[in-house]
């Protein structure tokens, strides 16, 4: 086990001043488990984690004490004149197996989806991924559970870090997390199990947009979760809509607020 500590404004104790600096200093051998303790503070960083076998945990009393924050968004025009798009808007990109995030807040601060479009907080395309007691905050497309679907609807729609990667399904587990947004704020193709989580709608829209591949047994499973409203009117939101034809979403023993439309799900023009 190799342990590292990150603190705002690194001191003589050997702490790293940023997560990006800690990532660069991790042991090269991926078989060595690494734990990164992150001291309370706000870390304005856009992160990519490509090394397996890593645990990142906030050292504060609650997940709101340790915040990873960035504000990229889909409608932003890049230097080449092309919009940033959904999959380059992430705050934290994880593309490695056996990663655990614990007691952290990961947020995309871009804001209103009508103005800024898609803005991913956490882009998780990985196997045996765990988020424990985390807050994942955004508006549209807050949490992407990769992989991408096999084909995009329009050219350049998947532009981002895994657009050319093999579509390998991963298993993801979210426990005691708070996840918020408005439009399609939990989306993707992974097999993902949400247990004891609060799924908070900030406005009219859709909590999920699964793209479960054909033949995959499970998509999203919500167990003992609470679908809550934070500023969302009555019957103005749906549990989800299918991003692709074989989307699978299951709820077990969940509490559903009055903001959810009686139909539960929207068909997004699909049969």
Sequence positions of predicted segments:
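Sequence-level preference for short, compositionally simple segments enriched
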Residues: 1-271
């Amino acid at each position: 086990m190799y342990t590292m500590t990150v603190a705002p404004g690194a001191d003589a104790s050997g702490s790293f001043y940023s997560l990006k600096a800690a990532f660069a200093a991790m042991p090269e051998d991926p078989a060595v488990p690494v734990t990164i303790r992150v001291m309370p503070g706000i870390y304005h960083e856009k992160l990519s984690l490509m090394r397996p076998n890593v645990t990142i945990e906030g050292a504060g009393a609650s997940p709101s004490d340790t915040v990873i924050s960035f504000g990229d968004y889909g409608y932003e025009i890049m230097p080449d004149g092309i919009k940033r798009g959904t999959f380059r808007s992430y705050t934290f990109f994880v593309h490695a197996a056996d990663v655990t995030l614990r007691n952290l807040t990961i947020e995309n601060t871009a804001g209103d989806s009508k103005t800024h479009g898609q803005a991913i907080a956490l882009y998780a395309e990985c196997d045996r991924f765990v988020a424990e007691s985390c807050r994942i905050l955004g508006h549209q497309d807050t949490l992407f559970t990769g992989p991408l679907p096999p084909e995009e609807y329009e050219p350049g729609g998947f532009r981002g870090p895994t657009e050319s990667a093999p579509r390998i399904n991963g298993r993801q587990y979210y426990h005691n997390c708070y996840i918020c947004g408005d439009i399609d704020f939990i989306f993707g193709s992974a097999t993902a199990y949400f247990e004891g989580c609060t799924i908070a709608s900030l406005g009219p829209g859709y909590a999920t947009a699964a793209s479960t591949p054909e033949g995959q047994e499970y998509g999203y499973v919500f167990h003992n979760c609470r679908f809550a409203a934070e500023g969302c009117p009555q019957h103005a939101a749906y549990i989800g809509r299918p991003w692709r034809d074989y989307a699978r979403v299951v709820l077990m023993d969940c509490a559903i607020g009055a903001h959810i439309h009686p139909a539960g799900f929207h068909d997004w023009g699909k049969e």
